[in-house]
A protein has these predicted regions:
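C-terminal single-pass transmembrane alpha-helix
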Residues: 249-287
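N-terminal targeting/regulatory segments, especially signal peptides of secretory
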Residues: 1-252
Length: 287
């Protein structure tokens, strides 16, 4: 039976760093309006205006007012950015109202992106955000890659906080690892090829290929945390105490398929000469 303090181990809205950044970014850029239209299979009115404002927000976030938060984990924020750009490019033709020219809107957006990414390519400053464009046709599989990337960001953030041990933070961390481990276990069981798919190999510490290392079994004691690398699913109570170990070698078939939707946020930084070019690109939308 759960103890009275089990509720302390439930993840709050501010406990997951990647989620916090994503929600703030989506609100600032109004990305949710675009995403909602996609999810509801509706048209987005005035797509040209929406893209114009979206570009302006990107300029402000990443080129005019970049934060240390973006620069400190710019590799991750760059992957986020590429994810969302590929998402938007994919769905512009699908959700643009028939009264607007979706091909023209998409082309102008692509030209805008060329200007921004070119600025990063030629900027040698180590104090500014940089990002390389990775052009890919958007597929639902990319959502899962993003889910894995977000998990690893949250995992790293938890481990940094746990350098000074706190049992409640530990059991929140354990809950998050267990939840994501179960989720990706189901994914791999449904699509076994994903386990060795290079798209799910973000780095040596964040990869489905090394499942047990990416998703360790976490036990939270009074004064320390124990992590064991294992492909086994760790069934724990909310305080992280091991109650059952269920062996599963990730090679089974026919488990329930569970693909999630979850978009995020992204990162950019500035070069004054290119900033002018990008702003000029914005005005093309108003011609």
């Amino acid at each position: 039976m759960p103890s009275p303090r089990d509720s302390e181990c439930i993840l709050g809205e501010n406990d997951l760093q990647a989620n916090v950044f994503d929600e703030k970014w989506k609100k600032t850029t109004k990305f949710s309006e675009f995403e909602d239209a996609v999810n509801l299979d509706q048209k987005l009115n005035k797509m040209g205006d929406w893209i114009f404002n979206f570009d302006a927000k990107i300029l402000n976030i990443y080129m005019v007012n970049p934060t240390d938060e973006l620069i400190n984990i710019q590799d991750k924020r760059c992957r986020d950015l590429n994810y969302y750009i590929n998402y938007v490019l994919h769905y512009i033709p699908k959700i643009t109202n028939h009264r607007e020219n979706s091909a023209e809107i998409k082309e102008k957006f692509e030209n805008f992106l060329i200007g921004i990414f070119s600025s990063w390519k030629h900027d040698r400053s180590s104090k500014k955000f940089k990002c390389t464009r990775v052009e890919k046709d958007y597929t639902p599989k990319m959502e899962l890659i993003k889910e894995l990337d977000d998990f690893c960001e949250n995992k790293d953030a938890f481990k940094a906080k746990l350098k000074t041990y706190d049992k409640i933070k530990c059991c929140k961390y354990a809950n998050h690892v267990n939840n994501r481990k179960s989720f990706f276990h189901n994914i791999i069981s449904s699509v076994p090829s994903y386990k060795n798919d290079l798209d799910f190999h973000i780095n040596e510490k964040c990869t489905l290929k090394k499942f047990g290392a990416t998703f360790p079994n976490v036990t939270c004691n009074e004064h320390n945390m124990i992590e064991i690398e294992s492909d086994a699913l760790n069934i724990t109570n909310p305080r992280g105490k091991l109650t059952e170990l269920q062996e599963n070698h990730l090679s089974g078939t026919n488990p329930e398929d569970s693909f999630n939707n979850s978009p995020t946020k992204i990162a950019f930084t500035s070069v004054s000469t290119i900033l002018g070019a990008c702003i000029s690109g914005l005005y093309l939308y108003k011609v």
